[in-house]
């Protein structure tokens, strides 16, 4: 009872003191609410503006006076808490300033402290029946207001998202109508600023019916080619389901001769192979037998061994594993069972085991082998320079390194092996800690990380700064009489020396925009106003600032007018003058209102007439009715990310918009027309989501997931090939702009284009008309679907619009088509053309024998010949030339972003699977994932993308083609080394060995540092055409 009374008394005392001292002083710095991770330091600042009296500061925690110790202590007026604890330090903090001379007190508003922590997570079953499975992720932890707790669900190792019968609702997972496809172990992860934890024990769900299907067939009856069209009989035992424990053992002559070695130690980046030699009897060669490799108990790779059994790519065990992902590094050889790695990474470490399973029998497993990876020595992340506040109690600079064995981290100053300055130490984790920061701590500090692999270093610059403070703040309000003199003081201290800027009513004041005879700006920051006028009255602000921050104080100036100022008008008694002034003012105001109303009505009439004219033209062009403006407006409101046209390259392409631009409309009408045109464009691209089917996720891109699916053929419009028109316009523009040049130059350019066009027609194996007939006869079109998951990310939305405008503006057989846009609900889908053979990089790896594509009785496809490689390069150059003529840039040209069909037609596309499948080919630079090994130096240094930077990337693409995409450019260098050498201009390029001699010079010119010296795509196309003709001869 006594403790409660004391707590209530403390809160009442704090609230009363907030109004005691308001007239004599106020706070210059108030304590701010904070959220920190547990065991981190906290600092509450508190400072009063009363610099003329002696003040004493106290702190209250939840209404109680704080008992200070080594962990919680007060320095000056500020409160410092070392290693914040959630059990003791959470709550509200109030600063109390006491004037020792008068005894007056003032209390600051309470500041809240929240401690972020994360201990454990567990899966709880809330309900389970035939219609619904309901799970909850219970988390022991807390998050701040700015960063809520993030929950992710996994089935086995597969990350779940809201899809079909799966719904994610905050901490709960709801599966409606669960079936056999939903069997597995469900686990959840929780993450916040304190870290990430996964539930130790998950929930294993198993549907009620579980048995192995068996196919009944007569003797000497051949297996049908399609397994999915057979009828399976599933019989379970009475009283329970049949499981693997009821299966018989495999025949003894089916066995594994040699499994993986007991323990293998491999360096990161080196190749290796795991052995699994097996014996397969002749009488079992026609049976369905699977060879599987497991990592840490989870299925990694599998292949069918039976000679006549079809290769379905699916396992006939009940488990679902997320480790069955596409990875070009891993190859499972069917002949000898060997699992080979092209290059080892740190995540490959684990326990490996191979298995043989005959259908309907227990699997045969080898002895497990352990693969250990010697991780490369590197910084994670790279240490960065930092500004430290002078007199700060504790400041930290982190330096974390990874490698095998664990590296030792140490710090040196100014590149010397001398000891660190006083009050500077290094903790066990390699963090550099500064205590009681002073000016002697300035300098360059180098972090050294070393182990048996060697030593790496990183240098950071430490600068000590002082936050600007008011030594003499402006005090107000100030009252003065007209024609008087006012002096407003404003002096500041800080390091670097702060600058002082005055403003009046939020408008900056300087000697250039004020009366120099009346306004004087003194060197110490004081503002003096002589001969004060009535218009000088207002709010004056003084802002001080340096590299450590900004501060501001306001003061109100009140100008009192003398009684003589209004005496002549009042004593004159001439009311007619006043009446006349009022009448004139009202007449002018009324005329202005009438003018504005008239203009509004006139603009409205013009807009309606123009709208009717545009609708008539749109109806004639489309051959049918178009959605009205109201519908377009509604669509724009549903998608704020696509409500405006942001690409400056898009032009008016219709006759109606061209006529509208030539009209004498006002600026307001032009903006309205542009907005309606943008909405009309996106409405034309609209596709119903119901038209998509069989969506399969193949990876993740920069703004969301990427799928491959099918689109109804009825929703696919016939393509409009603008290649000929674009070439004609380009030729005319070159002739018009090149009037000052020689006629021979123009003639040679036209000849090159004719040769380029003729060569392209020669290598086309399928006519365009035949392709159109094939598309019309097909019931479904294979498409690539890019989802916009990050709707609130402005950068992701901008990139989504850029790609949308790029593919919408181009209609060329060398560039994939944009079929439409699904905007009915989130996430929005961009639907692009896709091919039956997929991306070009996987095709090159398959022809090089790096991807196992062989089926029973067939062999891997042969490598590409030189003429075929030149044909692929020529088609890519034609597609990129179309992008250049449309005044766009690609920014991510590579073989992974091109597609190829079974008719050997190559198109430029934009899958950009930078998050998982091709994550090794991207590097995070300036908080953006970039393909640094394909980028020109100006893109990395200045973030400047032009057609010349696409030509630089095209040279790398040709290098990939002649190397069959079996290795990365400059794979001997790390990503950081590539960035450093590219910025320094020391990254050297060389063409592939198989490159024809006639192309070496022009390909090397693609990589020159000066963009103006690089060739154009038309010149590259002409050179490739000549090379193809010479190879054919």
Curated annotation (Swiss-Prot):
Source domain of life: Eukaryota
Modified residues (Phosphoserine): 678
Keywords: Cell adhesion, Cell membrane, Disulfide bond, Glycoprotein, Immunoglobulin domain, Membrane, Neurogenesis, Phosphoprotein, Receptor, Repeat, Signal, Transmembrane, Transmembrane helix
Membrane topology, Cytoplasmic segments: 603-1033
Disulfide topology: 46-95, 137-188, 276-354, 399-447, 490-542
Biased composition (Basic and acidic residues): 720-731
Subcellular location: Cell membrane
Domain Ig-like C2-type span(s) in chain numbering: 25-108, 109-199, 251-365, 368-463, 468-558
Signal peptide from the UniProt entry: 1-22
Name of this chain's protein: Tyrosine-protein kinase-like otk
